[in-house]
Regions:
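Interfacial/gating helices of multi-pass transporter permease domains
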Residues: 22, 44-64, 130-134, 198-199, ...
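Transmembrane helical elements of multi-pass membrane transporters/channels
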Residues: 22-41, 141, 152, 175, ...
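Small-residue-rich hydrophobic transmembrane alpha-helices
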Residues: 53-116, 149-168, 266, 281-339, ...
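Hydrophobic transmembrane alpha-helices of multi-pass small-molecule transporters
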Residues: 65-68, 179-184, 213-217, 290-294, ...
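Short runs within selected transmembrane alpha-helices of multi-pass transporters and secretion channels
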Residues: 74, 78, 142-160, 168-176, ...
Length: 460
């Protein structure tokens, strides 16, 4: 209880800039590590062929869905554990951890079963037997051996619920390093490994995830913590499962939006524009842009806790100062991202284009899409503000506008009217403008009625 109080005092009295840096930097590093898995895979797979890159780009939405289920379930488990630890009920917290890990195990088994019959998914987008074969080779391995990513993410959330964010970051770093080392060895057959192509990329990924999982399990089960996870609690408890999924299912839905968007965009490129190059280009963009967006998400995730605390403490000046600082930092991050994508698109795309088939398309894509980055800084800052002050529905609506509600219809119309891949990229700018317009109008009303009437408090 005393430690919790100190944490609360820090949230309310530590200088905002120092507090934001203190909370955001570990999150930024953790998220960048997650982004590296797919970026590294794409870099080495692109050295095989553009078709290989297209195949794993088609597989990516299913990988995103797996991670969405893992993160969503783990968020629900984390929320349940944190509440029980706050109540001083360590036995219930332990039961929440055990039940959460059990749910993650069951989820991994379901995905593994579907991994054996994944071929029809690729036939939705292409009739090319080589693309289908490479896609199945890659995704089947990732799904059948996907237990690593589920349990690793679950253990990371268990550690985070106990305030051990540094330990959770270490497990991610170790897994990423293993993946980066093994990728070229297993793809190209270096040293003791046979040449395995896209299958090698998949094996490198799952081995990295399993190494991270084993390390995370060791830290959870064998390191001294305030809770002890017992195997006897691995029997599912209906009430605990309901509490986990009460928070977890909305999180899974939110996390799945990106997967659905990827499927929709791939369908537009493959079935309307008949462009495998469009699929490969979008796959490269979506993975590279995560390196720009992950620092943004790290900052906004940290800021959400600061916003929520000072909103609850009715400290208007500190709330406003932290909000303005967050908007400024995110705008700088995204402006740097835009600048890099505008000035060096050829250099970035060429890293993933050994055959020269997507460079021209990639240059246009990176320059057009990156125009929405600074707008996204405002959109996402506003969205997490809604979450922090209890307007989660508005936050969800903004996410749907950004990635589904406006983006996919705009992409479809642009593809049908202009019949070019380049025209489709403008859907990102259109969707971002729509989302930020809704966000500004909604936040202005809320600010006037909920933020401005708060007492000044102390701005630090």
């Amino acid at each position: 209880m005393e430690e919790n109080q100190k944490s609360k005092n820090k949230m309310g009295v530590m200088p905002v800039g120092k507090l934001l840096a203190n909370m955001a930097i570990p999150m930024v590093i953790s998220m960048l590590v997650q982004a590296m898995y797919n970026v590294v895979d794409s870099y080495f797979v692109a050295k095989i062929s553009t078709d290989a890159l297209t195949a794993i780009s088609l597989a990516y939405p299913i990988q995103m869905l797996m991670i969405a289920v893992a993160i969503g379930t783990s968020v629900g488990m984390n929320s349940y554990m944190s509440r029980k630890l706050g109540e001083g009920n360590t036995e219930a917290a332990s039961k929440g951890a055990s039940n959460g890990l059990c749910l993650l195990l069951l989820s991994a088994i379901v995905f593994a079963i579907f991994g054996f019959v994944i071929t029809p998914f690729f036939r939705l987008f292409t009739d090319d037997p080589q693309l289908i074969e490479m896609g199945v080779d890659y995704l089947e391995i990732c799904m059948v051996f996907g237990l690593g990513v589920f349990i690793q993410i679950g253990c990371e959330r268990i550690l985070q619920s106990m305030g051990k964010t540094g330990l959770s970051m270490v497990t991610q770093l170790v897994g990423a390093v293993v993946n980066i080392i093994l990728d070229p060895l297993m793809i190209f057959g270096i040293g003791p490994f046979p040449e395995m192509g896209v299958a090698g990329a998949a094996y490198a990924t799952v081995i990295g995830q399993w190494v991270g999982m084993l390390m995370a399990l060791a830290l959870v089960f064998f390191k001294e913590h305030e809770i002890k996870i017992s195997f006897k609690n691995f029997r599912l408890c209906g009430e605990t499962v309901r509490e986990i999924y009460r928070v977890g299912i909305p999180s899974i839905v939110m996390q799945s939006i990106g997967s659905i968007m990827n499927v929709g965009m791939n369908a537009i490129f493959s079935r309307i524009l008949m462009s495998n190059a469009g699929i490969a280009t979008f796959g490269v963009y979506f993975k590279v842009q995560s390196i720009v967006f992950m620092p943004l998400f790290g900052v906004t995730n940290a800021s959400m806790s600061i916003f929520a605390y000072n909103y609850g403490a009715r400290n208007r000046l500190r709330f406003k100062k932290s909000w303005k600082m967050t908007l400024c930092v995110t705008a700088i991050i995204m402006s740097i991202g835009t600048l890099l994508f505008q000035l060096f698109p050829q250099q970035i795309v060429s890293l993933f284009d050994s055959e020269g088939k997507i460079t021209a398309e990639g240059i246009a894509a990176f320059r057009i899409i990156s125009l929405h980055f600074p707008i996204a800084a405002a959109s996402i800052t506003i969205s997490v503000t809604f979450q922090a002050i209890g307007h989660g529905i508005k936050s969800m609506f903004m996410s749907i506008l950004r990635q589904l509600g406006v983006l996919l219809p705009a992409a479809l119309v642009l593809a049908l009217v202009f019949k070019s891949v380049e025209s489709v990229w403008w859907c990102f700018v259109i969707a971002e403008f729509s989302a930020v317009t809704f966000g500004i109008i909604s936040l202005t009303k809320i600010w006037r009625h909920e933020i401005e009437p708060m007492p000044d408090g102390a701005a630090v």
